[in-house]
Structure formats: structure tokens, C-alpha cells
Amino acid sequence: MPTVTKTFNYTGTLQQATIPPGTASIDVYLWGGAGGGGSSDAGGPGGTGAAGHHVKKTSLAITSAQINTTIDVAVGGGGAGGSSGGGAPGGPNGKSKTGFSGGRGGNAGPRPYSGSGGGGGGATTVHIDGTEIATAGGGGGGAGAGAGSNGTAGINTNSATSNSPGTLGENGKDHSGDGGGGGAGGGGKDGGTSGNGGSGDQGGTGGRSGSNL
């Protein structure tokens, strides 16, 4: 049968396709949502968010029992950037409709002015007839800046969260005084851990990306 190509972009909803008769194998190419950037302080910029992971799986065999079954595709959204100001809220998380969303960025310190962390990216997942076959982790969020130092960038390697459920990225750590908020973890097969808020009037640290399947 001729090659059939379908492309799915982020919509915030679960998208579906049906495996047509005559299909022997499929190739899947996934990109997770990127982490949002941390916001700035007067002393410098926040950290950039990490890019979402790319996963490629080719020649996945399709059995006769899988013909006319449903492929579920959940494209992960990008995390939002942080904002600046006393107590500025962290960037909202990147969403994933299958429970693989990133965390929210950490809030800036309440006094007097710093940057908050960026939200973690949501993972992109593909399921066939309810079975997960591929996941591309979302990127970690960048950290907010303090007056004394910049926020650090989101990190594109995974350190798995111990929270439950484990597929969600961890929320960035809030700053309790004057300083930048931490970047959030990205969603993934193992959700990423968050970065910390800066000590004193310093920038925070970036979050970790989610892992892949």
C-alpha cells in the first residue's frame, strides 16, 4: 500500500488516527514541548528553557489484531516563560493530555524584584490501542534571575522526580526572600526534577527535562 503520512501539532486535545488495512509497520517521530525561559532581574537575564526531546522509532511492526485500532497522539505543549517583580508567579506548565505535563515555574521572591522560573514542557506520547509505544520528554524550565546572578538554563537530561504520579514534571521551587525562582521539570516517562530558588538575592537553577520511551 502507498505510504500514508500524518502530522499532529499541539492542540491541547487528544488526537487520533486509525491504522488502515494493509499496514505492516509504522514510523513515529516525536518532539516534546520546550521548557519556558526564566525571567530577568535588574542584574541580568533568566535562564533559557531546554528544548523538548526528539524520539524516532522506525519500522514498528503492526499485527493483524492492530488493524483498524486507534492511535492516540498527545502532543506536549511548551512551558510558559516566567515574569518579573516581587512575588512574580512562575510560568505555567506545558500540558499533555495523557498525564505527562511539565511543572509550573517557581515564584520569584516577594521582595522587592526578581524573576520567576519558566514552566516545564509537556511530553508527547503515542499509544496504540491503549499501549504506550513512544514518549518524548518535555524540556526543563529556565530559572529566574536575582540581582546578584543570572538564572541558569533548563537542563536537557533527566533526574527522575520522586513525586507521584512520576510522569509529571516537578514544580519549580519558590524563593522565600529576594531572588529568582527555580525552573520546573519537564513531563516524561520519568518526570524531571525542578531547580531551586536562588539563595539570597541570587538567580535560581534550571529544571531537568523529562525522560523518553
Predicted features along the sequence, with ranges:
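Intrinsically disordered, low-complexity, charge-biased terminal/linker regions in eukaryotic proteins
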Residues: 166-172
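Local beta-strand/beta-hairpin segments that build beta-sheet-rich folds
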Residues: 132-134
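Surface-exposed ligand/attachment interfaces on beta-rich extracellular proteins
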Residues: 10-21
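Extended extracellular/luminal ectodomain segments enriched in beta-structured repeat modules
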Residues: 20-27, 65-69
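Glycine-rich strand-loop-strand elements at beta-sheet edges
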Residues: 11, 32-128, 142-160, 167, ...
